[in-house]
Amino acid sequence: RFDPTCIFDIDGVDSDATHKLIKLVTQRFDEAGMPYTMHWGKTNHLTKARVRTAYGGAVDRWNAVRHLLLDNPAERQMFSSPLLDGLGLNA
């Protein structure tokens, strides 16, 4: 059902060196044209554009289902965050 994948996990100390490594790895993936996604709850360099590139139309489906499940704007706000807003996942 899915193409072969690989998980590249960088856990460890929250330091400048770790952040530089994560940025370097994602930069190299971008340069090589390798598709990838990143764990939401970990250190990442996600942007609205990166999320759209990684997930494509699934972003629209996410927002549609989010509106279906949380049809009240106050509920959507309760289950929101600046991260979701900035990534276009609370549209």
What are these regions (language model features)?
Residues 1-20:
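C-terminal substrate-recognition/cap domain of FAD-linked oxidoreductases
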Residues 16-23, 27-91:
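Activity-critical C-terminal alpha-helical subdomain
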